Amino acid sequence: MHRNDFTCFTQSVYTKKDGSVESQICCLTNRIVKLTRHFQTHRKDYSSQRGLWKILGRRKRLLIYLLQTDAIGYRDLTTQLKIRKLKKK
């Protein structure tokens, strides 16, 4: 998957308002993919790893909120973005 393919994919997946939970999750997923691609060449970039962990935590909190408010939308979004579902506690 090329760099521009993923951005177009996330923009085409969700076309509602920019501030909605789904669009925020799409943007965070896009940033996560870019950072993981960055780590393939820069393995010891620990400050960026910390930023990645913060982004992952923010996306996880948004996914929990989406699951609690709209379970069907959560399921659709996780399948469209091809991300794993949350673990049950």
UniProtKB/Swiss-Prot annotation:
Q: Which Pfam families match?
A: Ribosomal_S15
An example of a Gene Ontology BP annotation on this entry?
Answer: translation
Give the source's domain of life in one word: Eukaryota
Instruction: Reply yes or no: does the keyword Secreted apply.
Output: no
Kindly give the SUPFAM superfamilies that the UniProt entry links to this protein. Answer: S15/NS1 RNA-binding domain
Q: Which PANTHER family match?
A: RIBOSOMAL PROTEIN S15, BACTERIAL AND ORGANELLAR, SMALL RIBOSOMAL SUBUNIT PROTEIN US15M
Assembly information from the UniProt record = Part of the 30S ribosomal subunit.
Of which family is this protein a member? Belongs to the universal ribosomal protein uS15 family.
Q: Which named protein is this? A: Small ribosomal subunit protein uS15c
